[in-house]
Amino acid sequence: HPRPYVDRVNFNGTTLNMNGLKQTLNIKKVPGYENFDWGDGEAPDNEYDGLYNSGSFPSGHTTKTYNRGLGLATLLPELGPELVARAAEGGNNRVVLGVHYPMDVIGGRIPASASVTALWSDATFRQNVLLPAHDELENYIAARCKADGNGDTVAACVSKTGANDKNGYKNTFTDAVSTEPVTDRASAIDAYTARMTYGFSQTSAAGQAPVVPQGAENLLLTAFPHLTDAQRRQVLEASEIDSGYPLDASSNGFERINLAKAFSAKVTLSEDGSTITAISFGAKAPTVVKTASSKDTITGLLTDFNKYYVAGKGVTDEGKSVLAHDDQLT
């Protein structure tokens, strides 16, 4: 498919068959802003005109910006929503420049998500490269934060400086898709979510069961290290947008998972930690809490007392063992 600014009526001396689509969108290519010497022996130029003959789908620059943005978010999950929203902005810039269509950008995000997932799912690469990189980055930032009096950890620093709120990533740009400026975490998540579909209508069945790509749970390993793989997959399931949007059917779930939301999840576990009882999004940090015990203090004391003493029978064997141990200590 040709670039948006291509003259489809007179492209290299021919008229392109657009199968009923508009012959021109009246989009003008932004002029190159510099003549760069690429060191290839040719006269310096921006080589922008070479895009005329290249296809539009998918956007390779979008794949790169999401690849870097999603990758960095896994290394610094405390700012995950902001980093992936910034990646979405990079993809959107390709539309603003008039060199790609929104569908190209969606098509660029999907393989980037898949490639970062593949890296985190490679146990050797994860152990030898990604986790050490995560630790090095966290330790460096924590040391700088401590030196500046902003706490001893990245989480404390992010909270104190407000980098996960109104003092963090901002962008005043708005358009027909992302209608509100990014001013805090909530609006960053909204911008990312809007750019997942670009306002397209659903082209296949809505309301289908969630689909989480194999290994995608590893994207949340640093954000939720104490959850199981299955529980991290549940977080991704809960983050997903609805089914049926363009490219969903062929994406194996990568079109749907919303990593801006997932990195802001508050996960509530059962008292024993085995079951997720609730998931909400928009938290200032990746958070895991446990359901409070249903037993009140008096009930708990009575339960413990009955383990050691039974009315009509006296001290139990377990109680005698405790008393004997107490005698040894005293």
What are the functions of these language-model segments?
Residues 1-96, 132, 136-143, 175, ...:
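Hydrophobic alpha-helical bundle signature of multipass membrane enzymes
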Residues 148-180, 184:
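Extended ligand-binding clefts on enzyme/binding-domain cores
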Residues 99-162:
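Extended amphipathic alpha-helical segments with heptad-repeat/coiled-coil character used for oligomerization
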